[in-house]
């Protein structure tokens, strides 16, 4: 079999952070955040695409005002940008994080660096 299949949790009601794909070329994470949850504030460790498949994401980049993005949106975040992802408005926020190239190709740590 040439292809490789990756599975992710479906219909989660609690916080989920899954690193699904971690190859030399790309990282893909699956994240579910119930209302009121957020990811730690951190710097993007690659060129990031956030693919929102359920709910509404509140995203704050650097010192900008927060912006809301809804399911069906794909949001691009450049490399080495301070970011905060929150679920303020939805019962469940579900999204994928695609990092390409793999952070190691940019001499960045595999896991993002948290910031204040």
Curated annotation (Swiss-Prot):
Source taxon at top rank: Archaea
Gene3D superfamilies: Jelly Rolls (2.60.120.10)
Protein name listed in UniProt: Uncharacterized protein MJ0764
């Amino acid at each position: 079999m040439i292809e490789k299949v990756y599975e992710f949790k479906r219909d989660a009601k609690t916080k989920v952070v899954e690193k699904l794909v971690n190859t030399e070329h790309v990282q893909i994470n699956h994240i579910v955040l119930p209302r009121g949850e957020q990811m730690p504030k951190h710097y993007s460790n690659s060129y990031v695409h956030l693919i929102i498949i359920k709910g509404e994401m509140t995203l704050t980049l650097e010192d900008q005002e927060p912006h809301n993005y809804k399911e069906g949106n794909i949001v691009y975040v450049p490399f080495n940008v301070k970011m905060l992802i929150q679920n303020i408005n939805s019962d469940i926020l579900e999204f994928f994080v695609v990092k390409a190239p793999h952070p190691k190709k940019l001499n960045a740590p595999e896991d993002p660096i948290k910031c204040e």
